[in-house]
A protein has these predicted regions:
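Domain-level signature for soluble enzymes in the chorismate/prephenate branch of the shikimate pathway
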Residues: 1-139
């Protein structure tokens, strides 16, 4: 059970290539794509109808792209600083990602008051942060 998004941990999962590589998704047929998330990678390329080879990687996957072990990577991007440092760039955003509160069904029932109060406090905090952010952008 997922009662609410949390107001932190916002990032995105993206397809990443070496900087300056001018390529379209369609031209990636047969490419070797490295990722810590091979199932998401396979699903993405399958949905767009492009056959690629997916390589499961661990650790700093950006080094595999920089070293030429893979043609591209799929990884989580927050600020993009790591990409810039490693001469990489986002080619395509696959999906937005955020932290979420997850409650198991038994706790939802046995600790309803506590869980409900926690969810309500988080939602209130999100509204306050959103209002503060909106005021900051208007100034």
């Amino acid at each position: 059970y997922m009662p609410t998004d949390l107001p932190f941990g916002k990032c995105r999962m993206s397809l990443i290539v070496p900087r300056g590589r001018k390529i379209s998704l369609e031209e990636m047929e047969g490419y070797k794509i490295g990722s810590k998330y091979p199932e998401i990678t396979k699903s993405f390329f399958s949905n767009v109808g492009i056959r690629v080879k997916t390589l499961k990687l661990n650790g700093a996957v950006e080094l595999a792209a920089k070293a030429g072990i893979v043609d591209a990577i799929v990884d989580i991007v927050d600020t993009g600083n790591t990409l810039r440092v490693n001469d990489l760039e986002e080619l395509h955003k696959i999906k937005d990602i955020s932290a979420v509160l997850i409650v198991n069904r038994i706790s939802q029932k046995t600790k309803f008051a506590f869980v409900n109060e926690l969810v309500n406090r988080i939602k209130k905090l999100k509204r306050e942060l959103s209002a503060k952010d909106k005021r900051g952008r208007e100034q």
